[in-house]
Regions:
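Short N-terminal segments immediately surrounding and downstream of signal-peptide cleavage
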Residues: 22-40
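Bacterial Sec-dependent N-terminal signal peptides
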Residues: 1-26
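Amphipathic alpha-helical segments
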Residues: 35, 39-116
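A periodicity- and composition-biased signal for non-globular, repetitive helical segments
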Residues: 8-10, 41, 70, 127
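Amphipathic, charged alpha-helical segments and their helix-to-coil junctions
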Residues: 59, 103, 107-149
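A short hydrophobic/aromatic micro-motif that marks alpha-helical segments and, especially, helix-coil
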Residues: 17-19, 61-64, 133-136
Length: 149
């Protein structure tokens, strides 16, 4: 269940960043600045905590993005109608192996966060991240609905 939720969250974040950039020409820097401000406020991070947290957080996000990029490149092979069962097996195994790698890596980053943040603040940061993602999806959906009218 956790893996499914995690995969959904990662896919949403990746889509949000990509869609936001295309729709509004929002740069990754601008997107991250908005995300940082929102998460800092909602989690109640001090300026010092933010200075320590976000470089690590964005480092993790970049690594996660690269791992997911690899998984999606392999997954695209599945669109070919001539894909064999063995190739589908490789696609599935690679995807879930990558998710395991991300989960292990995230645990390592949480250890780093614990050096300067309480568990409560770590929880609050992750909660804020989820809320930010939902809010962005809602905004993007509203923009898409307006364009269709």
């Amino acid at each position: 269940m956790k893996i499914r939720y995690f995969i959904t969250l990662v896919a949403c974040l990746f889509c949000i960043a990509t869609f936001a950039q295309k729709k509004n020409q929002t740069s990754e820097t601008e997107f991250r600045a908005k995300q940082q401000t929102y998460m800092s406020q909602k989690a109640g991070l001090t300026q010092e905590e933010s200075k320590q947290f976000f470089p690590l957080y964005f480092e993790f996000q970049d690594k996660k993005k690269e791992i997911n990029k690899e998984a999606w490149e392999i997954a695209k092979q599945g669109k070919n109608p001539d894909t064999t069962e063995a190739e589908y097996e490789k696609i599935i195994d690679t995807f879930f192996d990558n998710q395991e790698t991300i989960a292990k890596m995230e645990k390592e980053y949480i250890k780093k966060y614990r050096e300067f943040l309480s568990n409560k603040k770590i929880y609050m940061v992750y909660w804020a991240e989820r809320k930010f993602s939902r809010n962005m999806l809602k905004i993007l959906q509203e923009m898409d609905d307006k364009e269709k009218k």
